A protein has these predicted regions:
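Acidic-basic catalytic patches of nuclease active cores, encompassing PD-(D/E)XK
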Residues: 1-37, 41-45, 87, 94-109
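Catalytic cores of nucleic-acid endonucleases
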Residues: 55-105
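Conserved catalytic cores of phosphodiester-cleaving nucleases, focusing on short active-site segments
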Residues: 13, 40-57, 76
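Short, contiguous strand/loop micro-motifs
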Residues: 1, 51-52, 139
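Short, well-structured alpha-helical interface segments that form or flank functional binding sites
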Residues: 8, 35, 59-63, 70, ...
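A cross-family signal for key residues in well-ordered alpha-helices
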Residues: 11, 15, 69, 154
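Non-catalytic C-terminal interaction segments of nucleic acid-processing enzymes
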Residues: 92-196
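Charged, low-complexity surface patches
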Residues: 2, 6, 57, 80-82, ...
Length: 196
């Protein structure tokens, strides 16, 4: 089975930022798991960097980078270095404060420096994102909902327990236990959550 080239490039980016002392989180979402998701989110003390990884430059990746500017101190686009540079795309990145990193043969080249957001509205980070695969093409990413469901399943195991008892004994992302119980019951009913 062939490995996803974007995932290979992302792994190189992860190694690069980790060599600079950053902790890297993968597939980090805004607003609880929506479509705005950074391939790599780097943290070092109070500094944060969002990195979008693609195999080629496009308006879509520039838009993705643009959306992360207010949620990290710096935002980068990471793409493979080609023979010719897309000077127009580089100018758009420069105009919008999005950094541009090129990668080829183990070497990273910063062609555009990002602007700095001094007080970003950073996303919630989860320990499980440390172990995720960045730029995976399987749609795998961590959300508060998925974490709640995993905790629910782990807590229940093979036991037959009252849902209200389970809810009151696990950490969840809902406003209160009543809304958690109602939401989870409806998710079980429509088959989003599978039970034995």
């Amino acid at each position: 089975m062939r490995k996803n080239p974007e995932a290979i490039l992302a792994k190189s980016g992860i190694d690069y930022f980790e060599s600079l002392g950053y902790t890297t989180y993968k597939e980090v979402s805004l607003k609880g798991g929506g479509s705005i998701r950074a391939d790599i989110f780097c943290k070092k003390e109070n500094e944060s960097i969002a990195v979008e990884v693609k195999m080629s430059m496009s308006l879509k990746i520039i838009e993705q980078g643009f959306k992360w500017r207010e949620h990290s101190n710096k935002t980068y686009i990471l793409i493979p270095k080609k023979r010719k540079f897309n000077l127009f795309a580089e100018q758009i990145c420069r105009d919008y404060g999005i950094g541009l990193l090129y990668y080829k043969d183990g070497i990273f080249t910063e062609r555009v420096q990002p602007s700095v957001t001094l007080e970003p509205k950073e996303p919630q980070l989860y320990e499980e994102q440390l172990l995720s695969d960045a730029s995976n093409n399987r749609g795998e990413f961590v959300t508060p909902f998925k974490l709640t469901i995993n905790r629910l399943i782990d807590y229940v195991g093979d036991n037959k327990l009252q849902l209200s008892n389970v809810i009151s004994n696990i950490e969840h992302h809902y406003k209160d236990n009543s809304s958690a119980s109602n939401s989870i019951k409806s998710m079980i009913k429509i088959g989003v959550i599978k039970h034995k």
